[in-house]
Amino acid sequence: MSKSLTIIWQYLRAFVLIYACLYAGIFIAGLLPITIPGSIIGMLILFVLLALQIMPPQWVNPGCNILIRYMALLFVPIGVGVMQYWDLLRAQLGPVVISCAISTLVVFVVVSWSSHLVHGERKVIGQKGKEE
């Protein structure tokens, strides 16, 4: 019985913390003069709490594992909503596909460039290069 209560407590704590960050983000988004989704601000709050080690990752792991495991189910309502506008989407399919492809390439280039900027070039062990 004690082990069951411990597991229930871990899941309850994880979801309470995740939702607390979400609702804090929604509250802050309501106060801001610019439009930023509250869920994005909530994720940033959760990230900062975890990155600064204010909140141990073990506290949110059980809830995150469940959300990741069932993530595909969370996209079903979005897919159904998109299918309601299939005629409009079909009429604009070319521009949508082109914009997705171009934005993907831009993301690849920006991530590659920023990765090289942050990490720099490192010598690979066993690779022959310039002798200094």
UniProtKB/Swiss-Prot annotation:
Alphabetized InterPro entries for the sequence: LrgA/CidA, Uncharacterised_UPF0299
A GO cellular component annotation in the UniProt record: plasma membrane
Domain of life where this protein originates: Bacteria
Membrane spanning residue stretches: 5-25, 38-60, 66-86, 93-113
Membrane protein topology class: Multi-pass membrane protein
Predominant subcellular localization, coarse grouping: membrane
The keyword Repeat is assigned to this record: no
Cystine pairs: none
Protein keywords: Cell inner membrane, Cell membrane, Membrane, Transmembrane, Transmembrane helix
Cellular compartments annotated: Cell inner membrane
UniProt family annotation: Belongs to the UPF0299 family.
Name used for this protein in its record: UPF0299 membrane protein KPN78578_25390
Natural source organism: Klebsiella pneumoniae subsp. pneumoniae (strain ATCC 700721 / MGH 78578)
Phylogenetic lineage: Bacteria, Pseudomonadati, Pseudomonadota, Gammaproteobacteria, Enterobacterales
